[in-house]
Amino acid sequence: MEGPLTIPVLDKGFVRLVDQMGDDRAIVQAARVSYGEGTKTVREDAALIDYLMRHRHTSPFEMVVFKFHVKAPIFVARQWFRHRTASVNEISGRYSILKEEFYEPEAFRKQAKRNKQASEGALLDEEALALLRKVEQEAYGAYRALLEKGVAREMARMVLPLNLYTEFYWKQDLHNLFHFLKLRLAPEAQWEIRQYARAIAEIVKERVPLAWAAFEEHLLEGAFLSRTELRALRGLLTPEVYEKALSSLGLGGSRLKEALEKVFGPGEAL
């Protein structure tokens, strides 16, 4: 792998690619375990990776692993660590004196009216931002004062707010990394963690372009349909109309057949 790739995020944060094991070829090799790497072309590799993604064959994607160094506000890290399939190691406030680095948004957001856990629209309130900075200064001042009085680092840190920056290493396989990106790139994800997801997506797209294309097509921009939703579609479409629409978008052969069967079932598809 080439030198470290670092992308700035928020006002003081970043995402840095530390290491990578495997790439698109590792996915293909795992899927063709009986034959080894072989002499397949990039086009054939892309078709195989696309097949694996749309049929939810996940284990070949687990053969690719990324390790990132991340600097993010504590409240972002706590959301991040809800994804429990990764290996994580975070800077310790028991062993280190934490730096006076706080995330300060350009503007606050209003509480969403329809979603209790979301926000919407900018709240341009200089008094609110001034209050945030006041709390930061007082909290960090109290932290340093406690340390000077001999209070243990593991206890002095209790006064620090959630917008303090933390750093951690995060190692994740590609299958679960795609799941992270599917959730954290979504519009309903908190804005701050979406910025980190976008930075990671930029790196992943560059490093495994064939896998990213399949992820984007089938998971990121795709959707699952319930039984009720399928019934509604079948009531609005005929196989002939749907086939014509799919063909106009470039689908043909087995891909066209699969798409028809997905909506109308194997007994009804053309």
From Swiss-Prot:
Residues 13-218 form the ThyX domain. DUMP binds at Q79, W80, F81, R82, E90, I91, S92, G93, R94, R157, R184. The active site is at R184. It comes from the Bacteria. Its cofactor is FAD. SUPFAM superfamilies: Thymidylate synthase-complementing protein Thy1 (SSF69796). Keywords: FAD, Flavoprotein, Methyltransferase, NADP, Nucleotide biosynthesis, Transferase. The gene is thyX. This is Flavin-dependent thymidylate synthase. It catalyses: dUMP + (6R)-5,10-methylene-5,6,7,8-tetrahydrofolate + NADPH + H(+) = dTMP + (6S)-5,6,7,8-tetrahydrofolate + NADP(+). Homotetramer. Pathway: Pyrimidine metabolism; dTTP biosynthesis. A motif (ThyX motif) lies at residues 82-92. One of its GO terms (biological process) is methylation. Belongs to the thymidylate synthase ThyX family. Pfam families: Thy1 (PF02511). CDD domains: ThyX. Catalyzes the reductive methylation of 2'-deoxyuridine-5'-monophosphate (dUMP) to 2'-deoxythymidine-5'-monophosphate (dTMP) while utilizing 5,10-methylenetetrahydrofolate (mTHF) as the methyl donor, and NADPH and FADH(2) as the reductant. PROSITE patterns: THYX.
